């Protein structure tokens, strides 16, 4: 049976009683607050990558991906006011999710997409209040792809997508949500990553 979940209204309204932090085991490795609403899922997904400072790839194989999904899928669906079981993920699913993660990484770092192409599919439905909702489709990695691209779409319409960034410190590379008033941050933590990069530059110059 197809697993479905209401993503929420087209304006991206999340359940007001839910905390997006509960769906962020990967992001919590960095010690940061989650991104607002459903965008927390996208940031969380990107922060599953290997980090020399914070741990292994949480999508490294099917078992790791399944463990990650067991936390994230129910928490995300609760954030959106519904209830689902996490999709089953195999080694193949984990590999496809890593490919998807690379694609999203490219978008954040300015990779040119090129010709328009299909990246996923969702279903539209009316909820009990008459709001249009998007519903992830597919099984395994396709379910996550559908949910993640839906959240990207909602954040682009809400004007928050441009605040999702990748730290410029190569040793960190975490995905962070820029909360600065002018959206000018380039480090996830200006107190640690900023000085590290400044010191590296000084060493290269022999200062």
Task: Locate each region found by the language model.
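Short metal-binding segments enriched for Cys and/or His
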Residues: 195-207
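C-terminal structured interaction module
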Residues: 180-182, 200-201
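Short helix-coil boundary/hinge micro-motifs
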Residues: 1-177, 206
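Cysteine-rich micro-motifs
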Residues: 183-195
């Amino acid at each position: 049976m197809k697993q479905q979940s209401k993503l929420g209204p087209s304006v991206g309204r999340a359940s007001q009683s839910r905390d997006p932090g509960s769906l962020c085991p990967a992001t919590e490795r960095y010690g940061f607050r989650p991104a607002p609403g459903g965008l927390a899922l996208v940031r969380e997904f990107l922060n599953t990558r290997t980090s020399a400072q914070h741990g292994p790839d949480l999508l490294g194989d099917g078992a790791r991906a399944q463990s990650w999904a067991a936390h994230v899928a129910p928490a995300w669906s609760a954030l959106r006011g519904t209830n689902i079981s996490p999709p089953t993920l195999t080694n193949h699913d984990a590999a496809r999710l890593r490919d998807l993660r690379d694609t999203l990484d490219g978008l954040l770092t300015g990779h040119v997409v090129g010709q328009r192409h299909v990246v996923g599919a969702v279903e539209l439905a009316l909820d009990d209040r008459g709001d249009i909702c998007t519903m992830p489709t597919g099984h395994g990695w396709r379910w996550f792809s559908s949910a993640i691209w839906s959240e990207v779409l909602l954040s682009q319409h809400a004007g928050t997508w441009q605040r999702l960034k990748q730290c410029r410190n190569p040793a960190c590379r975490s995905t962070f949500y820029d909360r600065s008033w002018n959206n000018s941050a380039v480090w996830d933590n200006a107190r640690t990553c900023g000085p590290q990069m400044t010191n590296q530059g000084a060493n290269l110059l022999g200062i």
